[in-house]
Curated annotation (Swiss-Prot):
GO terms for biological process: 'de novo' pyrimidine nucleobase biosynthetic process; 'de novo' UMP biosynthetic process; amino acid metabolic process. This is Aspartate carbamoyltransferase catalytic subunit. GO terms for molecular function: amino acid binding; aspartate carbamoyltransferase activity. It comes from the Bacteria. Pathway: Pyrimidine metabolism; UMP biosynthesis via de novo pathway; (S)-dihydroorotate from bicarbonate: step 2/3. InterPro entries: Asp/Orn_carbamoyltranf_P-bd, Asp/Orn_carbamoylTrfase, Asp/Orn_carbamoylTrfase_sf, Asp_carbamoyltransf, Asp_carbamoyltransf_Asp/Orn-bd. It comes from Clostridioides difficile (strain 630) (Peptoclostridium difficile). The keyword Transferase applies. Heterododecamer (2C3:3R2) of six catalytic PyrB chains organized as two trimers (C3), and six regulatory PyrI chains organized as three dimers (R2). Catalyzes the condensation of carbamoyl phosphate and aspartate to form carbamoyl aspartate and inorganic phosphate, the committed step in the de novo pyrimidine nucleotide biosynthesis pathway.
Amino acid sequence: MLKSRNLIQPEDFSIEEIDEILELAQKIIDNPSKYSRICEGKLLATLFYEPSTRTRLSFESAMNRLGGRVVGFSEPNSSSASKGETLGDTMRIVSGYVDIIAMRHPQSGAASEAARYTEVPFINAGDGKNQHPTQTLTDLLTIKSLKGTLESHTIGLCGDLKYGRTVHSLVKAMARYKNTKFVFIAPEELKMPDYIKEAIKGHAYYETNNLDDVIGSLDVLYMTRVQQERFEDKSEYERLKNYYILNKAKLEKASKDMLVMHPLPRVNEIDIDVDSDDRAVYFKQAKYGMYVRMALIIKLLGINED
């Protein structure tokens, strides 16, 4: 049983609780039929105020594969938000209909605000440029499954580190594991925010704008797209969107067992010629997301998985 009934940010769970979720996700991967009816009679609401493919569909697939059902909306114009209904009122109403809620919202901090009004477990499926904790759990499962441990890795994060909520959540989560080192690879305009660097005090980190110089030292390279939707000045986005492009030639400088990860969607930052490389695990990573969300739903609903 998890101590918190909500997941707003990775720190809501202890390392032991995260390990429990990852272990359950692995059990589901190994024997999915065992869990195919465990959420029968349960209802998940997916409330997506912002476009999503992987996160929304993986939540819906997760609940369906557990034997539960899903209701919700995929964009705000199909909800009463378009009529001016407050987030709090929406949460009060929806939590009276369902057993668990997953919400994505473009505003940073919206998840913690929404959770105040729910009477059922609540999952942050991404809030603005703030946090994306279920992606973080997915990333942790990917690293643990393929590297065998979450300790003693050098993690390179490349691209939009200013607006990328996935990297903010991942850095804070990985900083809880021993001997983790970080390399932040970004242009000056998209550097990792100071509040994230402050949160990982005590861990070694290095900042650079040159991927070629550091790729050979990495255990994991986490590529990100430049977040077009966060830019007010579109010319600035156009100038920065292709700042980093990972291709086969660049990969020749990397170690043979480095993992190339990406939260997806990608734009141009990973060339398709990388897809066939054994180190490219981003499609496997996306599939792991469904299993992590299956495990999280089971845990937050307090269902005995045995």
